[in-house]
Structure formats: C-alpha cells, structure tokens
C-alpha cells in the first residue's frame, strides 16, 4: 500500500529539491529543521508572550507542567500533519478535496483564511508597540505603512520565497533564544521553584467555573489558563505544517526528518514560553500587563539596562515573526482550498497573502487613530474559531488514519489517544469561546 504513495510523493517536487542531499554541504541537523520553526514562529507571537508573562506574574512557576502538556498536544498535531504531507504526497486540503470533494476543502481554506485575516490586525499592533518601545518618537501608523509596503514588495520580488523565509526564521529563533535566555539568567530565578513547577498542581483562586456576565462585564475564572491553551496549542498552525513540508520538498525518505523537525519546533515553542514565564515569575510577580508595550515598560526598572535592551530586541523579533507568516498561512491555504497551486512562490497565494496583510494593516491603523479595539472584528474571528479549530483537528486525525493515504504509517494507538485528547481540548475551548460570544452579544 505504501508504494503508490511513495511514488506520488515525487510528483510535484521541484527538480531543484531532488537529490538535494547529494549536493548540499550544510550539516544534516541544519537541513533537518525548517518547516516546524516557521510554525513555532507564528504560534509564539506577541499574544503567546503576553500570556506566558502574565501567567508567570500571576501564578509563578506553578503552571509550567501545563505548558509542557500543551506542548505535547501541539507536537502530536504538528508531527501528524507533517507525516500526512510527507507520506500522502500532497497538502492536507488537496487530500481532502480528492476524497470528500472541493467544497469541503474550500470551507477549510476560506475559514482559515478569514481567521488569519481577522487576527492580522493584532500582529500589526504588536509590531507598532514593539517599534514604539525601541524608538518612542516614531509615528506607529507610518511604521505600519512602511513595514507592510516593504514586505509586499519583497513578496513579489523574491524568487525562492520559502528558502528565504526558512533561513530568516532560523535567525529569528536564534535571536529570540539568545535574548530571552540572557534575560532569565540575569533574573536568577529559583531553581527549586522551577522544578516544583513541573509537578502538576492547581493555583489557589483559579476555579473551573464557566464565564459569567457580572455588572455588564464578562468574568472568566479560567481566562489565563484558556489563553495558554489557545495560544500554545494552535491547530491552524499545526494544519499548515502539512503544507510546509511540501514546500520543503520532503518525500518518504525524509519521513524521520519531518518528525524530528516537528519535535524541534515544539521544543523551541514550549522552551521560549517557559523562559518568559520563569522570567516574569521572578521579575514582576503580581503585576500582569495589558499589552507587550506595557510589559516592556514594567520590566525596564526591574531588569538591568543591558537585560532590558535584550528583552526589547527579543520582543521585536517576536512581533515580527508571525506578521508575514500568519498572512501567508491564510493566503496559501485559501488558494489550496479553492483548487489553486498552493506553493508560496505561486501567484494566487501571494495575492491572497497581500489581501490579508492589507486588511490587517487598515484595521490596525484605524484602531491606532481612534484608540478603540475593533470589537466586532474580534467577535467575528472568535466565532470562526468555534467552527474552524475542531474542523481542522478532525481533518488531521481523519487523514492520518486513512490507509489509502498513510499506508503502513497510519497513526498508532498512542498517537490517536493523544490526538483524541487534543481534539477534546479543542472542542472544550470552542465551547468556552461560544459561551463568551453569547454573553458578549446578549
């Protein structure tokens, strides 16, 4: 059963990628990572950084174990999607279209593109906040206009977009790790407290209650816990891993390489989140921040001057990482869903990517001008995740268990158990978001 799949894997792989191992003189471990680092960069954005910092500030080291568990679930879905792309010989949307019809694939593509589009404005605001932290006198709106313009020019000028993107993300990941590791070393956290944080326990004052509307506002006792799960365990980013391994040109002979790449990406994601959580637990206990700009300012008097500079540089890297990748996920998955070529170098993914970027920039500039958040857009994006996240999780598990796609490499019992646990978490999160939407609109 695996032989036709292997043959199909060769189809559509650019000639430049075939026989790459024979010509490439770079270390094998360096070639074995790439797609998952791109995924890690889009998942660990400003929202993840802020959530990790606030959990550390509010609960100390006590929820490090939950971060590890969330990383395991994310790793399960990332490796599964990567295996689908490598063994199946096509992207997840293409495989869905071949078996369930183009309309089903289109629903997935349109939904994911709209989710990326509605939240792209927050990536713009994060870049603006990070730039203002480094250069306070600059007008954030002009920063956004120039930044988006440069990236759009680059999108259409670059010939090998994926290769450049992968190399850039490797550099950015290295920069993030360097900056935040220096910070946590200078902060001198309690090693015993960190070890205890990996032992499952529940913080005092945090209940398992549901969101409630009190005095016109919504109170959610598990908002930080839910945010940690939502920002670290991203089904949409995991789904895109199947596309990225196709961009890389990996085939069945690269099966173990795809798994190793996914593990490396998850380790980076959870590792950086843990470092931020530990640093905040030591430096700003009991002082959670509302946005990354406030977080940087709150750390200024507490970190040494050199450490604060490193933090701001790392912060800017975090803000920039998901800026382009989020838009590219939306653009390429939409093109893939409606039956257009999905590679980043193709025309339609680039056009849709620009559309997502422009929509996010316009909304962010309006928000900066008025000082008000686009509440209706946020509600719309949250409503899309209620449908989209469970749909993508089910799709990944369904594809990974089909013998006509995976052959002898179908999901094992352990992977299905972890995948089922992840699906349960995704469904519960969707129900929770739905409850908050009902309370908001009532």
Where are these regions (language model features)?
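Membrane-interface "cap" regions at the ends of multi-pass membrane proteins
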Residues: 1-50, 174, 224-225, 250-256, ...
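Transmembrane-helix boundary/entry motifs in multi-pass membrane transporters
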Residues: 21-29, 60, 86-117, 134-140, ...
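Extracellular loop-to-transmembrane helix junctions
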Residues: 27, 54-79, 93-98, 102-106, ...
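Flexible loop linkers connecting adjacent transmembrane helices
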Residues: 52-56, 79-104, 129-135, 160-164, ...
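Extracellular/periplasmic helix-exit of transmembrane alpha-helices
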Residues: 75-87, 245-246, 267-294
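Hydrophobic transmembrane alpha-helices that form the core helical bundles
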Residues: 87, 105-137, 144-148, 319-338, ...
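Transmembrane alpha-helical segments of multi-pass small-molecule transport proteins
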Residues: 109, 134-158, 174-179, 346-363, ...
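Hydrophobic alpha-helical segments and their helix-loop junctions in multi-pass secondary transporters
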Residues: 174-213, 222-226, 231-242, 395-404, ...
């Amino acid at each position: 059963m695996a032989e036709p799949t292997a043959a199909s894997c060769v189809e559509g792989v650019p000639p430049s990628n075939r026989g790459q191992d024979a010509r490439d003189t770079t270390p094998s471990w360096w070639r074995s990572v790439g797609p998952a680092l791109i995924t890690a960069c889009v998942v660990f954005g400003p929202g993840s950084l802020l959530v990790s910092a606030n959990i550390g500030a509010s609960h100390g080291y006590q929820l490090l174990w939950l971060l590890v568990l969330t990383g395991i679930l994310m790793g399960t879905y990332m490796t599964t999607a990567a295996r689908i792309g490598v063994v199946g010989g096509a992207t997840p949307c293409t495989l869905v279209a071949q078996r369930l019809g183009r309309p089903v694939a289109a629903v997935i593509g349109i939904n994911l593109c709209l989710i990326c589009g509605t939240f792209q404005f927050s990536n713009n605001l994060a870049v603006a906040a990070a730039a203002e932290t480094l250069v306070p006198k600059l007008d954030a709106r002009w920063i956004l206009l120039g930044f988006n313009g440069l990236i759009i020019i680059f999108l259409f000028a670059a010939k090998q977009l994926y290769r450049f993107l992968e190399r850039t993300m490797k550099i950015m990941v290295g920069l993030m790790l360097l900056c935040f590791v220096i910070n946590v070393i200078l902060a001198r956290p309690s090693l015993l407290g960190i070890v205890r944080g990996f032992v499952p326990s529940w913080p005092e004052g945090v209940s398992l209650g549901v969101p409630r509307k009190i005095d016109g506002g919504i109170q959610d006792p598990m908002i930080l816990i839910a945010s940690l799960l939502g920002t670290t365990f991203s089904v949409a980013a995991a789904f895109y891993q199947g596309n990225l391994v196709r961009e890389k040109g990996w085939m069945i002979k690269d099966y173990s390489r795809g798994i190793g790449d996914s593990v490396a990406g998850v380790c980076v994601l959870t590792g950086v989140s843990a470092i931020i959580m530990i640093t905040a637990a030591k430096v700003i206990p009991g002082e959670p921040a509302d946005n990354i700009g406030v977080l940087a300012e709150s750390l200024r008097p507490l970190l040494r001057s050199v450490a604060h500079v490193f933090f701001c540089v790392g912060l800017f890297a975090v803000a920039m990482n998901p800026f382009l990748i989020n838009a590219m996920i939306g653009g390429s998955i939409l093109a893939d869903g409606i039956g257009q070529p999905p590679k980043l170098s193709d025309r339609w993914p680039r056009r849709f990517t620009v559309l997502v970027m422009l929509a996010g920039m316009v909304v962010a500039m309006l928000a900066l001008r008025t000082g008000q958040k686009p509440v209706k857009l946020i509600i719309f994006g949250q409503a899309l995740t209620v449908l989209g996240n469970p749909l993508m999780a089910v799709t990944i598990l369904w594809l990974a268990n089909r013998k006509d796609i995976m052959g002898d490499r179908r999901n094992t019992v352990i992977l299905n158990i972890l995948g089922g646990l992840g699906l349960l978490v995704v469904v519960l999160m969707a129900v929770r978001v739905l409850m908050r939407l009902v309370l908001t609109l009532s």
